[in-house]
Amino acid sequence: MTDHSHLAAVRDSYDTVATTYAVRVPRPSELDPLNRAMLAGFAELVRAGGNSRVADLGCGPGLVTAHLASLGLDAFGIDLSPSMVGIAREGHPGLRFAEGSMTALDVADDELGGILAWYSTHHTPPEELPRVFAEFHRTLAPGGHVLLGGYIGEDEHLSPAEAYGHPVSYRSYFLPLDRLAELLRGAGLVVAARLEQAASGRAKRPDVCIVARKPERP
């Protein structure tokens, strides 16, 4: 897929599944204890840095955005899908949500204290991830943190015909943990912590959380 076509496939697919997805996706309180702890730890790191402005990239219906706000962060959400953004705005009228792509964020240089990419980068072709992570580096303030959560695999990709009972056209890519960490480092970020969990229960494949930060200026 070209850059344009993969973004269109993700946007159109999530527009199609948005209503069902918003009902079925786990609430933050339903996440496993370690993932909840990673979100809480991320929020604490961001608050300690003195810049609480956080972008939740691929925010979907805004559930995790609202959770970050409840943890004391100035959180806002960005999603490719207009339908997802509409659901997020309706469900969380006190928060800001906007349409956009993590490949070209409408955010100023050094603006953010934190970036959350919570199970939202796996539809990005591997060759596009350096561009995405470069945007993370550009928009983070020095000392700011990224929390990336997602599924991993051995350079696998899937092209499902349907999801959540609806037809979809996106692809999902599952990279090894070490490669994700290497790509983050390649964008100029420092990997500070990694959590890997085996497939179990609702998670049908291994998943990871990676905390990275933008170095302070010398």
What is the role of each PLM region?
Residues 199-218:
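Core SAM-dependent methyltransferase catalytic element
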Residues 152-171:
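Short, glycine-/aromatic-enriched active-site segment of Class I SAM-dependent methyltransferases
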Residues 53-57, 61-104:
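Class I SAM-dependent methyltransferase SAM/SAH-binding core
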Residues 1-49, 154:
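Conserved class I S-adenosyl-L-methionine
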Residues 144-150:
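Conserved beta-strand signature within the Rossmann-like core of class I S-adenosyl-L-methionine
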Residues 103-115:
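A short acidic, Gly/Pro-enriched loop at the edge of an enzyme's catalytic core
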Residues 130-142:
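A short glycine-rich, Lys/Arg-flanked "PGG" loop and its adjoining helix->strand segment in the class I
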Residues 172-187:
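Short alpha-helix
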